[in-house]
């Protein structure tokens, strides 16, 4: 551990890896002689300065930093707090480790609770919540004419059936690429991403299991390929970073980081950090179908697109066989059953590994965030 260089190195046998911290983009893992980006060149790569918003401490969430304004009845508060007590307790056969819970109703912060050491502004790992962030960025770029989601990527290495893959297929997990998303096997594709210098290259080289659009298979590879495609379309990491952070500022989000790999690809879908209140803002933004502070940030049709269930055959290897839209899971009864049985049919959610949830319930004007490191 080197505090002066803000880096951590580890070595197993002949393999050495170093993680370096860079302002604005978080930590990047690089290896010796990777042939991609050495540590020195990565440190010379400085992200554009996107100023933070000066959110007033006396202005209520979501436009300011003020906390809960108590409007719940004692009965409702007791019910919610009782449920939270269960989430924060460890008297179960598996690790719960809840970090935070926050609830917004009708656009107001009505409940929040944090584990010791966690604050409303603490950036927390969202893991696959980054897939939702990537889809929101795609909506912004699509509306601006910077991205055609139905245009084939035409990746030069794809000279077979994969040549038909578009951003739409990547966002809806219907690319047809064969990718092992399991985490139980240490050598699975998903686990290999954590030690890869170029995550998109590892993903691009996967073979096609089915033609694009015919099969739903949830895979982080789709999000990483999409992120690399954004770099190509926008002119590199710095521009992709700027587009993402500018979108976040438009919806009052200051504490959101999507880290980059050693090749310079933002790792949407697995290495994102965002604070609890900012996750709640993301959910509120989706509930409002792209409206923020009286302005249209992303057109309403994009959120209809996100909530359109994928019409493709379910791959048997999916660990979660539920309805998916674009970047979000849908709480539909048919054809696979609800992902959250106690919630209404119109509910949808961003979902990250180890229990990261951003749940939106339009019919109740409700947004719920839960973060943690739950193992089950």
Annotate the PLM regions.
Residues 253-260, 308-367:
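Active-site Gly/Thr loop motif
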């Amino acid at each position: 551990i080197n505090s002066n260089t803000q880096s951590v190195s580890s070595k197993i046998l002949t393999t050495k890896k170093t993680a370096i911290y860079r302002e604005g983009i978080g930590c990047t893992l690089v290896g010796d002689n990777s042939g991609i980006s050495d540590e020195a060149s990565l440190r010379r790569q400085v992200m554009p300065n996107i100023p933070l918003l000066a959110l007033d401490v006396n202005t209520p969430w979501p436009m300011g930093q003020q906390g809960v304004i108590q409007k719940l009845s004692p009965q409702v508060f007791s019910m919610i707090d009782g449920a939270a007590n269960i989430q924060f307790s460890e008297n179960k056969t598996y690790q719960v480790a809840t970090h935070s819970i926050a609830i917004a109703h009708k656009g107001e912060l009505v409940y929040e609770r944090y584990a010791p050491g966690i604050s409303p502004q603490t950036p927390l790992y969202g893991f696959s919540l980054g897939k939702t962030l990537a889809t929101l960025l795609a909506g912004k770029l699509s509306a601006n004419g910077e991205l055609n989601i139905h245009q084939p990527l035409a990746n030069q290495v794809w000279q077979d059936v994969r040549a038909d893959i578009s951003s739409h297929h990547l966002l809806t997990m219907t690319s047809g690429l064969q990718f092992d998303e399991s985490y139980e096997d240490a050598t699975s594709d998903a686990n290999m991403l954590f030690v890869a210098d170029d995550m998109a290259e590892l993903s691009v080289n996967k073979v096609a299991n089915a033609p694009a659009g015919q099969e739903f298979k949830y895979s982080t590879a789709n999000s990483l390929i999409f992120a690399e495609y954004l770099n190509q379309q926008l002119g590199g990491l710095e521009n992709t970073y700027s587009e993402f952070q500018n979108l976040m500022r438009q919806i009052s989000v200051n504490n959101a980081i999507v880290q980059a790999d050693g090749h310079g690809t933002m790792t949407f879908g697995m290495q994102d950090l965002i604070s609890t209140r900012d996750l709640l803002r993301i959910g509120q933004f989706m509930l409002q179908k792209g409206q923020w502070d009286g302005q249209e940030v992303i057109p309403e049709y994009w959120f209809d697109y996100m909530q359109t269930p994928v019409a493709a055959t379910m791959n048997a290897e999916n660990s979660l066989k539920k309805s998916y839209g674009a970047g979000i899971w849908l709480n539909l009864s048919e054809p696979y059953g609800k992902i959250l049985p106690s919630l209404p049919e119109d509910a949808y959610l961003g979902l990250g590994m180890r229990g990261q949830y951003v749940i939106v319930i339009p019919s109740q004007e409700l947004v719920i965030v839960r973060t943690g490191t739950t193992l089950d």
